[in-house]
Amino acid sequence: ARGSIAIFNRSYYEDVLVVQLHDLQKGYQMAPRVLEQDKDEFFAQRYRQIRHYEQYLYENSYRVVKIFLHVSKNEQKKRFLERIDNPAKNWKFSASDLAERAYFDDYQRLYEQVIDATAAKEAPWYALPADQKWYTRYLVSEIVVDALEHTSHNYPVLSTEAQQNLQDC
């Protein structure tokens, strides 16, 4: 709703990352005309759809800010080990994390491809170093504050009739 802030963790971008890496689109229940496209055409279409959707949001007064948190392979390993070794963090870890780690370099290539294909002036990407959490949080806060400062955030003005109705209450 207007005046609200929403945060999407991964969102529709998951559909062009994991799905593309593992060819999961082949199992989609979609019209043959869609599934018969070769893989490059299929995902080029997805990128175009994302750009158009974000353009639509922008043109309807929504602000889209996309942040990619880049964690190095060494830092990822360190965080995984912390999650395994620390019982308070066990819930954050899944064996599937290790399986996906084998694709680290492939994911980096796809992240770059997706960011390049979907970045726009109206819906920019911010690729941030994320090995040092304090610094990443600082950068994210700066981006969010800047976005909020450049957003119209005036309260709606009630019509004279609506104001009178309030007085009558």
PLM region descriptions:
Residues 1, 56-62, 118-120:
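Conserved catalytic network of the ASCE P-loop NTPase/AAA+ motor domain
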Residues 103, 107-169:
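NTP-dependent small-molecule kinase module
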Residues 1-42:
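Conserved nucleotide-sensing/catalytic segment adjacent to the nucleotide-binding pocket
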Residues 21-25, 81-86, 142-145:
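Short secondary-structure boundary/capping segments
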Residues 14-19, 73-80, 135-138:
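Switch/connector loops and helix/strand junctions flanking conserved nucleotide-binding motifs
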Residues 64, 72-75, 79-90, 109:
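Domain-level detector of nuclease and nuclease-like folds
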Residues 62-75, 95-99, 120-136:
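Phosphate-binding beta-loop-alpha motif at adenosine-nucleotide cofactor sites
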